[in-house]
Regions:
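Charge-rich amphipathic alpha-helical interaction elements
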Residues: 1-150
Length: 150
């Protein structure tokens, strides 16, 4: 039986590399999104802690001079939260874009892999039928040779 050789092997290797790169990019985007979500949770916790501290201070003594910096700190934290929310939205959009890119690369690889499998099975069937024909020819020639000798 002749060995099977896939002529599109370089394309298959390129598509495997493209899939790996797309998967790595997608994974990095997921990690970046998760880090931003952790940062957002931390900022929200800081805001809650600051608001609790301010309410404790107000229960003891309310002084407008101490309240102004507290309000500025709250506004600053809220701006950071809004900025982080915006960054998360961008990261999620990028993550979705990279997910689609990965799926495209995966589908391209799968199509070439299916083609390779199809060609390989066709090759095996062809080689098997050739071998069977060759065996039949050998058997028939022996039979004819033996028939002619008798």
């Amino acid at each position: 039986m002749r060995a099977f050789s896939f002529r599109l092997e370089p394309i298959l290797l390129l598509r495997e590399g493209a899939r790996k790169n797309a998967l790595a990019s997608y994974a990095r985007s997921i990690i970046a999104s998760k880090e931003l979500e952790k940062k957002l949770d931390s900022l929200k916790k800081s805001l809650g802690d600051l608001q609790k501290d301010i309410s404790k201070q107000r229960q003891k003594v309310f002084s407008p001079s101490t309240d102004v910096p507290n309000q500025a700190a709250i506004v600053n934290l809220k701006k950071k939260i809004d900025s982080t929310n915006h960054s998360i939205e961008e990261a999620k959009a990028n993550e979705n874009k990279l997910r689609l890119k990965f799926l495209d690369a995966d589908n391209a690889l799968k199509s070439v892999s299916r083609l390779k499998e199809k060609q390989e099975s066709a090759h095996i069937e062809e080689q098997t039928s050739r071998e069977e024909l060759a065996l039949e020819d050998v058997i028939n020639s022996r039979f004819n040779f033996n028939s002619n000798i008798r």
